[in-house]
């Protein structure tokens, strides 16, 4: 992976957005039948259980993927009102188009509706998909669909967030626990003398929220000078995050740092900090690396974000699907590490998401 640290960088160019129609996008030939697979019937055996490699290692080992005529990939994503998932979709669709693969994208309207996403995933199974890719809302929410797909010889691939524990399902994305730990370590570096910190959590049922929170609190134990005085869910909602952060700052006016489990909520925290006249005085670390957060980092109102690589993840999911369909062995975890974006390097990532 070209972005495993704060010093190595990757830039994917030319990944264009595709217009979304009626909660579902498809390639021009989206209704064509799915192509056959040399892995059909035994696709789960092609996934190396417990194996983990970076995306660059996997690409170097397996080479450029190719597709048979009629191959169609289906991606079940989250709500596209969250621009992070829009970039994930863009990576998926751009790579599918680059490789001449038919595709179809299914999104949900409610970020917390496991039922809605499950219904979309079940529908995808009936659309002639050669492989199923998904960004599940919960760790087990789409397992029944994954099981059905694998039983039919259809690869199942998770892009970011809820890593399934089912054998044969490939996960493409970062370690969410490490993301939380990275945020805690960064804050500790900014507060060498310690101080009070607060955390704004995502939806309680979200694997990302759970794992990022666990990583953050675990890492705080390595920094005894940091005192977690408040932690509350805002369920990925910016307005709720602003209200909660305002209450936290009223109760603890000497809070020195906030960690928000995504950038959308962090923008709400920033508004609360600004309203208290504390702009630039309270450390604010978000997660995801969305463009709006990076604009605020450039303006000096927002300290840092632990940036993920959704465009890279979406594109890599296409590659993994095609490798599996070609009968190639793939690790169960294709790691796409996150990295810190702050005032020192934000100019390199001011627009878009890698």
Regions found by a protein language model. Give the residues of each.
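A residue-level marker of the well-folded mature domains of exported/periplasmic proteins
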Residues: 2-13, 19-354
């Amino acid at each position: 992976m070209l972005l495993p640290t704060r010093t190595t960088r990757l830039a994917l160019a030319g990944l264009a957005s595709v217009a979304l129609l009626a909660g579902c996008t498809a390639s021009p030939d989206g209704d064509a039948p799915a192509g056959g697979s040399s892995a059909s019937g035994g696709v789960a055996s092609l996934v190396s259980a417990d194996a983990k490699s970076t995306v660059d290692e996997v690409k170097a080992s397996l080479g450029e993927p190719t597709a048979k005529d009629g191959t169609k990939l289906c991606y079940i994503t989250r709500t596209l009102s969250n621009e992070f998932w829009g970039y994930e979709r863009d990576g998926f669709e751009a790579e599918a188009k680059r490789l001449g693969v038919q595709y179809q994208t299914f999104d949900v309207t409610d970020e917390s509706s496991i039922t809605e996403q499950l219904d979309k995933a079940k529908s995808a199974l009936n659309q002639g998909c050669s492989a199923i890719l998904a960004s599940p809302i919960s760790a087990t929410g789409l397992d029944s669909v994954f099981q059905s797909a694998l039983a039919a010889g259809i690869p199942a691939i998770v892009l970011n967030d809820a890593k399934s524990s089912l054998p044969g399902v490939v996960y493409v994305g970062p370690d969410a626990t490490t993301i939380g730990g990275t945020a805690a370590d960064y804050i500790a570096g900014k507060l060498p003398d310690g101080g009070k910190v607060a955390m704004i959590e995502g939806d309680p049922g979200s694997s990302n929220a759970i794992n990022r929170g666990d990583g953050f609190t675990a890492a705080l134990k390595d920094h005894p000078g940091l005192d977690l005085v408040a932690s509350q869910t805002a369920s990925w909602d910016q307005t709720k995050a602003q209200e909660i952060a305002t209450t936290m700052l009223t109760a603890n006016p000497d809070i020195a740092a906030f960690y928000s489990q995504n950038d959308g909520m962090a923008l709400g925290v920033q508004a609360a900090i600004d309203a208290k006249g504390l702009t630039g005085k309270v450390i604010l670390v978000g997660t995801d690396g969305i463009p709006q957060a990076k604009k605020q980092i450039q303006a000096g109102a927002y300290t840092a974000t632990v940036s993920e690589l959704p465009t890279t993840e979406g594109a890599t999911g296409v590659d993994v699907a095609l490798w599996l369909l070609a009968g190639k062995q793939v690790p169960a975890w294709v790691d796409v590490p996150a990295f810190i974006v702050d005032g020192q390097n934000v100019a390199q990532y001011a627009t878009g998401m890698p």
